[in-house]
Swiss-Prot record:
Heterotetramer of two alpha chains and two beta chains. This is Hemoglobin subunit beta. One of its GO terms (biological process) is hydrogen peroxide catabolic process. Red blood cells. PANTHER family: HEMOGLOBIN FAMILY MEMBER, HEMOGLOBIN SUBUNIT EPSILON. Residues 2-146 form the Globin domain. Involved in oxygen transport from the lung to the various peripheral tissues. Heme b binds at residues 63, 92. Keywords: Heme, Iron, Metal-binding, Oxygen transport, Transport. InterPro entries: Globin (IPR000971), Globin-like_sf (IPR009050), Globin/Proto (IPR012292), Hemoglobin_b (IPR002337), Hemoglobin_oxygen_transport (IPR050056). SUPFAM superfamilies: Globin-like. One of its GO terms (cellular component) is hemoglobin complex. GO terms for molecular function: haptoglobin binding; heme binding; metal ion binding; organic acid binding; oxygen binding; oxygen carrier activity; peroxidase activity. The gene is HBB.
């Protein structure tokens, strides 16, 4: 994947403003609420029976932060995303059996969360760079499936 200097700048400058705990929790909660079939991968998280329960669930919050923290590794390693996510791809494919389509869904949700949090800074150019990034990350995570 080739990243222009502008794309790299747009991604890293926005990332510097992201509250990983809050945005990660919101992104995962939205995924579980908007796409309820994804909840089956999180049965050990306890009560996911309603949007209120999901939003207030500390395990959802903690895992959302973990997910977005690992996304930060992509931001730091834009030129080596495939290798950055090799182990996570293996885990999600071989052990967790996560449908790779869920990676794309989470990427789309992350775009919505970023747009909501950074409306003024989330220009069309910024969105284009982030769409490319979430697509590349989703592809890297799905790599072990192919």
């Amino acid at each position: 994947v080739h990243w222009s200097a502008e794309e790299k700048q747009l991604i890293t400058s926005l990332w510097g403003k992201v509250n990983v705990a809050d945005c990660g929790a919101e992104a995962l909660a939205r995924l579980l609420i908007v796409y309820p079939w994804t909840q089956r991968f999180f049965a050990s998280f306890g009560n996911l029976s309603s949007p209120t329960a999901i939003l207030g669930n500390p395990m959802v919050r903690a895992h959302g932060k973990k997910v977005l923290t690992s996304f930060g590794e992509a931001v730091k390693n834009l030129d080596n995303i495939k290798n950055t996510f090799a182990q996570l791809s293996e885990l999600h494919c071989d052990k967790l059996h996560v449908d790779p389509e869920n990676f794309r869904l989470l990427g789309d949700i992350l775009i919505i969360v970023l747009a909501a949090h950074f409306a003024k800074d989330f220009t069309p150019e910024c969105q284009a760079a982030w769409q490319k990034l979430v697509r590349v990350v989703a592809h890297a995570l799905a790599r072990k499936y192919h």
